[in-house]
Every structure is written in structure tokens, then in C-alpha cells.
């Protein structure tokens, strides 16, 4: 990489974009500093000296949000950044997906992309800056990379598409789309949307691609100026004689029939047996310790299996489980299978099964998000778990990994647009989707299961949502789009395109591909085929439960809303929270108070709610002119008596207002503790209350 500082500038969505090279992190293979508005991201690319054994490309993308970038000190005892949060993990995945397909086939060196957010401007996306930084760090390095790529955020407001909308614009946008690609094609899409049509989504994707092309041209100019010298990478060539011999054995032993085993576990077992038989043929003839030969035979076998699966789909239109390209696996749905939970849905599609379980909580049970932007209170959460037994395997039980976090977030994005507002449903909602079986499309099964759980729980959702995953097999001059892909089609195909939505439109999409990019024609056809599949699944789900239940579970908390004047909030809270804690301790409820005076009272027992409401009403009660009260004498003065109308509110009963008859001394007719009926005659500007008993006698 060049050691001389160079600065390159352009404009991006009305803001300055600057890329600097040659000054920072010079021991990395490639490093750039990206300045976008007031956002600053350092992106580096580093590769290992030697390749790694194995049949996968060891690429790692990291995205680190430094709290100092937003002028914050991290919370917690240690006061330093810990492991990446969910948003940082999702951004790392977002950057990984468009970059990964653009490395040479067979490249096995460890590659690590590091993105450090050094300064964060909420209106100048650090995520998109990091994507460009990652592309540039690779492009100016000696690492072989077939980029550059770029990514943009697209919004949709009042029928117009916007590149990189501001925080304020995102709040009113019907679309939050991230799209990435290179000059010739799109190779990554991720979006959440408010029932966007397929055509609107298609236009948004390619509106974004126009800006991507300009950004790629800008990066290419930088590369041409720097002229990095790339590592020479020569892929390992197969022994063609060995390939032909292994291929002949697979045909002899019935590879086609083995692939066309409809049951996943049986197919996997049959393929393992076939591979073992063929490998044994070579072990019998060669040195049994010749591990290199055995590895080579296994690698050839894996390639031949992939080629056969793709040939069957592309040429014979037969899928491994016997389905047609647009056919969905058998469906089954159930609700209400867990008696003590607040809502549950079981969704099964072929050999993929998800159990989604819903819990309702008070508004105070929200998740607090404290990242580089303002603190956010999240009242809808979807979590996804993928245990080892779901694919018949054993292994250590760990905290959720990147994949589980990503699938959970995709489901959350697909469902959040149908969740009712706080005013209509004052609850925090958490759904956990447990994948019990998996043979592909488990994230979409979790979306379907979650919709069932929402309706089973009685959540008044705006519309049901279903999800489906689309696949793709390309040939030189043709392509085949697959509906509802299974695991083998995902692993050996060219695309995993997940689409979720209602009957009216899309609420979330996510596209991963293993080829350079997709044309407009393929994306358009995939979206339409996904729409038909989504509606078929939706119709099945609605046969199980067609609308939300009218009542919540008996075990769900009840939430009652009441409103007080904002200036009374401090009375309910009390000094240092004393009064509100007393209410909670006495009644056992959860209290959430909004700044506008709205109070949410939550508890399982209605009697607890009623008692809390009574206490709050007593605290916030106000005297009204013309109303009568049974008052208690609290203090006597020469000029009258102070009487208590209700807790926290006293009134002056002037001596002239005690009786229509003349009174010399207050003590002649009243003593402390006496009860007397009074009428409120005046409340002055300072809130002082004057009362009269005489007015009731006249």
C-alpha cells in the first residue's frame, strides 16, 4: 500500500465524502479513512501470509462502534466497550455479504476487515461509510479482490426515493433499504418496509444501484491513481484424470438417484455412504496414509454432488426432494399449544419447524438501546434460537452467534410494521422463535410462527405476515428460480432471497448471493414468484387462525391507561420516587408514566390495578368550584379554619363563611377533627381554595 498520504473527494447524497490513504494503519495490507459529513470510519484489510486448510473462504468482517465517536462514556463497571452489540453485529454481516462473492474462487488466506467508527454523525450513516471503507481498503491493498463495491441506504417518502435519508426522514419513510453491488449488478439487498409493493421495491433497488455505480466509479479512479500491486493467486488445478475416474464411479454407483432422496436425513446418509464407498476404492489401491489423495477425492466428490444438484434443477427441473421449481413443501400450523404462555404458534414447512412463543410485559419492560445515536426504547423484540438438535447434531451450547442475531433481527424487521401503537396496545412484546427442525428457510418459518403467536395472544396486529425464501441456479445462458428452498439448495445454489410481507405488500427482504450479481430481470421474477408463494402460505396460516383472539391470556398482565395533568406527575412520583415506590409496594403493579401525563398500570390481578388507580386518583384529585365536599377541620385560626377536602388538598373556610349567623370565635362552633360539608367558591391564581358552609345554608 502507498505510504504517502492521498486525499480524494466527492459528494454523496448532498454531503461531502472524503477517502484518505497512506497515513493511518500502514502495516495493514490496506487501510483508508472515510469521512462522510462528520462521520469518520477507519477501515483496514489484512490477509494471512499462508492459506488455510479447508473448503471454505476464511473471511471475517468486524464493525466496532467506539462510544467516544458520539461523545459518550460506556456504561457498566469497567467503563469500556465490550463485545459488539446486535446493531454492530448486523452491520458486520451487511458488509460481509456483498464482499464475499468477489474474492477469487479457491482463495483460502485468512482475510480480516476491521471497521472502527471514530466519529458518528447520525445523519451520515457510519454503516454505509464502513461498507465503502471496506471496499476501498481491499481495493488499495495487495489482496486479490474483484471490486470495488458500494452500498447506499434508500428511503421512500411521498412517492419519492431518497438516497441516505436523515434520521428525521427515516421516521416518516415507508422503506428502509440497504442495497449494495458493483458497477454491473446488485449483489446484496436488505430492507424493512411498510407494505411496499414488489414494483416499488424493484424500483428502489435499482434507484439505489444508480448511485452505487457513481460511487464505484469514484473508487475505481482512486485505485487507478494508486495502482496497487496485487498478490499473484493461481488456483490449484485438479488432476483431470482423477476427476474423470471419480466421476465415472459416481455415475456407476448412482449419484443421481442418491441426490433424489426426498428425506433430508436419509439423503445425507446415502451421500455419506456413496462418498465412503468411492474413497475406499482409492484407499485399496494407494497408501492408506495418503491423506492428500483422500482429501482431493472428497473435494472432487463434493464438487460433483454440487454439479449434479444444479444440473437436475436447471436441465431436468427436478429438485432433490422431487418438487417443481415453484412448489412449496407441505405446510402445518398450530396455535395455543403452550397453556401457560401468553401466546404460541407452531409452524412446520417440510422438515423445517419453528415454535414461536410470545410474552406480554408492561411498557417498562422495554429494551434500552444505547448506541452511537440517542437512547432508544424498544418495545417489540424477536429472538431466534437454533439449537444443535434441530439438524440432528451435537455440540457446545453457546450464546447466540451472528447468524442467530441476524435471523432474529430479520424477523423483527418483518413484523414490527404490523405491531399496534402504544396507544392501541400498551404492552411490551417479546417473541422467541425456537427452531426445532431445520432443512432451510428457518428464519422465514420463525416469521410465520411469530404471526401465529401474535394472533393467538390477542395482539391486534394490522395484518398477518408470512415469509418465504427463494433460490437460484444459473447456467451460462439460463436460470431457474426456486420457491421455498431447502438446505441443499441454499448451500449449493446461487441465491438465498428471503421475502416477508402481508397480502398487500413486502415488510422485509434479505438477499445473499454467491455469484457476482443479479440482473433486474432475475430480481423482478424472484419478487413475483415470492409473492405468489407468500400468499399460498398466508392462506394456509389463516385456516388455522384467521384473526387475533378477542381476549388476552388469563396469565398475561392487564394494562389500564389513565391520564393526569402533567404538572401532577411530580406528585405521583414524590420526592426521590418515594410516592411511586409506595404505590408499587402496596399494590404490586408496574407503573409507567409518560411526559404528557399518560399512566400505564400493569398487573395480572385487576384488583391490584384498581387499587393503584384509586391511590393515583386521590393524589392527583383537584378541587372544583361549585363542588361540595365532606371536609375535616385540620387547623383553626382567628380568621377561619383550614379544612381538608381530600388527601393533599386543603381549603380556607373563612369565619364569615361558616354560618349565616354571626360568629365571634371559630372555636365556638368548630374544633379540630370535626367534619363539615363545604362548597368550593373560589380557586385563585396561586391555586389557593376558598370554601363556604354558609352557601349551603342559604
Curated annotation (Swiss-Prot):
InterPro entries linked to this entry: ExoRNase_PH_dom1 (IPR001247), ExoRNase_PH_dom2 (IPR015847), ExoRNase_PH_dom2_sf (IPR036345), KH_dom (IPR004087), KH_dom_type_1 (IPR004088), KH_dom_type_1_sf (IPR036612), NA-bd_OB-fold (IPR012340), PNPase (IPR012162)
For this protein, the Enzyme Commission number is 2.7.7.8
Entry's transmembrane regions: none
Q: What is its main location?
A: cytoplasm
Indicate which residues the UniProt annotation says bind Mg(2+). 490, 496
Q: Which Pfam families match?
A: KH_1, PNPase, RNase_PH, RNase_PH_C, S1
Q: Which residues form the KH domain?
A: 557-616
Q: What does this protein do?
A: Involved in mRNA degradation. Catalyzes the phosphorolysis of single-stranded polyribonucleotides processively in the 3'- to 5'-direction.
Provide the protein name. Polyribonucleotide nucleotidyltransferase
Q: What is the lineage of its organism?
A: Bacteria, Bacillati, Bacillota, Bacilli, Bacillales
Amino acid at each position: 500500500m502507498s505510504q504517502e498520504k492521498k486525499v480524494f473527494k466527492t459528494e454523496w447524497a448532498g454531503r461531502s465524502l472524503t477517502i484518505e490513504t497512506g497515513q493511518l494503519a500502514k502495516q495493514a495490507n490496506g487501510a483508508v479513512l472515510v469521512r462522510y459529513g462528520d462521520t469518520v470510519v477507519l477501515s483496514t484489510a489484512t490477509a494471512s501470509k499462508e492459506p488455510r486448510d479447508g473448503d471454505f473462504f476464511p473471511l471475517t468482517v468486524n464493525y466496532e462502534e467506539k462510544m467516544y465517536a458520539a461523545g459518550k462514556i460506556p456504561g457498566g463497571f469497567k467503563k469500556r466497550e465490550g463485545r459488539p452489540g446486535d446493531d454492530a453485529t448486523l452491520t458486520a454481516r451487511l458488509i460481509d455479504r456483498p464482499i464475499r462473492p468477489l474474492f477469487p474462487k479457491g482463495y483460502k488466506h485468512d482475510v480480516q476487515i476491521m471497521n472502527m467508527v471514530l466519529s458518528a454523525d447520525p445523519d451520515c450513516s457510519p454503516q454505509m461509510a464502513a461498507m465503502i471503507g471496506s471496499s476501498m481498503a481491499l481495493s488499495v491493498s495487495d489482496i486479490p479482490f474483484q471490486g470495488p463495491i458500494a452500498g447506499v441506504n434508500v428511503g421512500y417518502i411521498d412517492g419519492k426515493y431518497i438516497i441516505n435519508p436523515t434520521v428525521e426522514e427515516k421516521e416518516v419513510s415507508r422503506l428502509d433499504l440497504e442495497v449494495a453491488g458493483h458497477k454491473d449488478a446488485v449483489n446484496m439487498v436488505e430492507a424493512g418496509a411498510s407494505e411496499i409493493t414488489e414494483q416499488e421495491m424493484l424500483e428502489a433497488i435499482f434507484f439505489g444501484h444508480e448511485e452505487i455505480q457513481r460511487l464505484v466509479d469514484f473508487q475505481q479512479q482512486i485505485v487507478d491513481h494508486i495502482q496497487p500491486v496485487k498478490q499473484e493467486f493461481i488456483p490449484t488445478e485438479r488432476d483431470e484424470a482423477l476427476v474423470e475416474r471419480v466421476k465415472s464411479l459416481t455415475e456407476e454407483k448412482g449419484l443421481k438417484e442418491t441426490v433424489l432422496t426426498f428425506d433430508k436425513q436419509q439423503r445425507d446418509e446415502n451421500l455419506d455412504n456413496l462418498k465412503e464407498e468411492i474413497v475406499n476404492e482409492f484407499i485399496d489401491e494407494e497408501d492408506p496414509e495418503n491423506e492428500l489423495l483422500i482429501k482431493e477425492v472428497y473435494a472432487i466428490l463434493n464438487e460433483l454432488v454440487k454439479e449434479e444438484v444444479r444440473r437436475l434443477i436447471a436441465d431436468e427441473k427436478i429438485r432433490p426432494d422431487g418438487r417443481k421449481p415453484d412448489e412449496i413443501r407441505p405446510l402445518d400450523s398450530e396455535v395455543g399449544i403452550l397453556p401457560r404462555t401468553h401466546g404460541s404458534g407452531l409452524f412446520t414447512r417440510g422438515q423445517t419447524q419453528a415454535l414461536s412463543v410470545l410474552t406480554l410485559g408492561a411498557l417498562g419492560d422495554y429494551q434500552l438501546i444505547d448506541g452511537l445515536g440517542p437512547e432508544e426504547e424498544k418495545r417489540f423484540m424477536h429472538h431466534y434460537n437454533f439449537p444443535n438438535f434441530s439438524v440432528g447434531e451435537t455440540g457446545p451450547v453457546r450464546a447466540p452467534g451472528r447468524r442467530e442475531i441476524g435471523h432474529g433481527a430479520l424477523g423483527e424487521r418483518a413484523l414490527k410494521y404490523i405491531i399496534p401503537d402504544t396507544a392501541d396496545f400498551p404492552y411490551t412484546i417479546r417473541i422467541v422463535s425456537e427452531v426445532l427442525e431445520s432443512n432451510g428457510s428457518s428464519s422465514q418459518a420463525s416469521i410465520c410462527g411469530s404471526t401465529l403467536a401474535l394472533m393467538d395472544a390477542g395482539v391486534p396486529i394490522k395484518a398477518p405476515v408470512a415469509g418465504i425464501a427463494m433460490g437460484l441456479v444459473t447456467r451460462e445462458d439460463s436460470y431457474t428460480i426456486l420457491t421455498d428452498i431447502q438446505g441443499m439448495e441454499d448451500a449449493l445454489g446461487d441465491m438465498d432471497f428471503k421475502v416477508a410481507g402481508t397480502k398487500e405488500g413486502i415488510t422485509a427482504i434479505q438477499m445473499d448471493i454467491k455469484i457476482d450479481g443479479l440482473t433486474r430481470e432475475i430480481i423482478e421474477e424472484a419478487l413475483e414468484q415470492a409473492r405468489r408463494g407468500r400468499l399460498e402460505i398466508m392462506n394456509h396460516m389463516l385456516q388455522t387462525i384467521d384473526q387475533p383472539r378477542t381476549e388476552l391470556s388469563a396469565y398475561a398482565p392487564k394494562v389500564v391507561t389513565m391520564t393526569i395533568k402533567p404538572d401532577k406527575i411530580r406528585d405521583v412520583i414524590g420526592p426521590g420516587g418515594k410516592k411511586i415506590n409506595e404505590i408499587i409496594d402496596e399494590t404490586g403493579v408496574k407503573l409507567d408514566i409518560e411526559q404528557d401525563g399518560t399512566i400505564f398500570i400493569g398487573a395480572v390481578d385487576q384488583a391490584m390495578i384498581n387499587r393503584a388507580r384509586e391511590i393515583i386518583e386521590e393524589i392527583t384529585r383537584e378541587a372544583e368550584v361549585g363542588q361540595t365536599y365532606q371536609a375535616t377541620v385540620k387547623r383553626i385560626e382567628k380568621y377561619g379554619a383550614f379544612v381538608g377536602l381530600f388527601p393533599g388538598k386543603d381549603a380556607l373556610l373563612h369565619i364569615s363563611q361558616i354560618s349565616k349567623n354571626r360568629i365571634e370565635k371559630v372555636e365556638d362552633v368548630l374544633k379540630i377533627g370535626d367534619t363539615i360539608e363545604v362548597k368550593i367558591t373560589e380557586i385563585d391564581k396561586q391555586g389557593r381554595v376558598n370554601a363556604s358552609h354558609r352557601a349551603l345554608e342559604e
